[in-house]
Amino acid sequence: MKAKKKWGQNFIFDKNLLSKIVRASGVGEEDFVLEVGTGHGGLTEELAKKVKKVVSFEIDKELFEMSREKLKIYKNVVIINEDILEVDLLEIAQEHFDGNSFKVVANLPYYITSPIIMKMLDCKLVKEMTVLVQKEVAERICALPGTKDYGMLTVFVNFKAKPEILFNLPPKVFVPPPKVESSLLKLKVYDKPLVEVKDEKLFSEVVRAAFGQRRKVLSNSLKVLGFSKEVLHETLLKVGISPQARGETLSIDQFANLANALYLLIKE
């Protein structure tokens, strides 16, 4: 079956490579696993041999029918024909994993990688993710402050999880080959966020504002939050950040300190 461009489909058929991905994920016989993008069912099948149960989402009706037929011999596999971004993960866990925590292993559709990762990290039952993503995205997630790859995605992911690039894959291992290299990325989710913030929503707003206009200094870019330049100037100095600094130079700790200081101002 031909890959459909609109779904960002790039399949892996090499069983040795699929097996390597499953081994690298570290999943075992007691694990519940959620997969995004069943495709032809190759990765699903390798997972089914190793874990307690796999729930796999496939948005493409034809692939869903085909993979469901192919994998019906596995009693620990459930394939669902729905858009992962539209489902309630807690309900899925309740229905299929007895409400237990689960791991995510997937060859993610590249055009919606970030929304899927963020949705998973927002679910308190996701303990770990091992996902194939564009190499460029993996490098952005693992970037350090002050580098060109460091951005909003870096901060949001690292706030919730510890990222590690396990290995890279060339385009030729996929059918059809994408135009870019890929990486297998592991995200170990923290029991609680890396830093303590008083208000996660405000923390997110501060990060978004700081990166919203990358060339602007913080005392200007943060004005969209409704604070005057003078108040921002004073607050930044109070938490040890130069008002002339730009968002891409701040560590997650600094973002947290800034958000917490602004939170206290709002509460006054």
From Swiss-Prot:
It catalyses: adenosine(1518)/adenosine(1519) in 16S rRNA + 4 S-adenosyl-L-methionine = N(6)-dimethyladenosine(1518)/N(6)-dimethyladenosine(1519) in 16S rRNA + 4 S-adenosyl-L-homocysteine + 4 H(+). Signal peptide: none annotated. It is found in: Cytoplasm. One of its GO terms (cellular component) is cytosol. SUPFAM superfamilies: S-adenosyl-L-methionine-dependent methyltransferases. Its EC number is 2.1.1.182. The keyword S-adenosyl-L-methionine applies. It is an enzyme of class 2 (transferase). SMART domains: rADc. S-adenosyl-L-methionine binds at residues 10, 12, 37, 58, 83, 107. Belongs to the class I-like SAM-binding methyltransferase superfamily. rRNA adenine N(6)-methyltransferase family. RsmA subfamily. This is Ribosomal RNA small subunit methyltransferase A. It comes from Caldanaerobacter subterraneus subsp. tengcongensis (strain DSM 15242 / JCM 11007 / NBRC 100824 / MB4) (Thermoanaerobacter tengcongensis). The gene is rsmA.
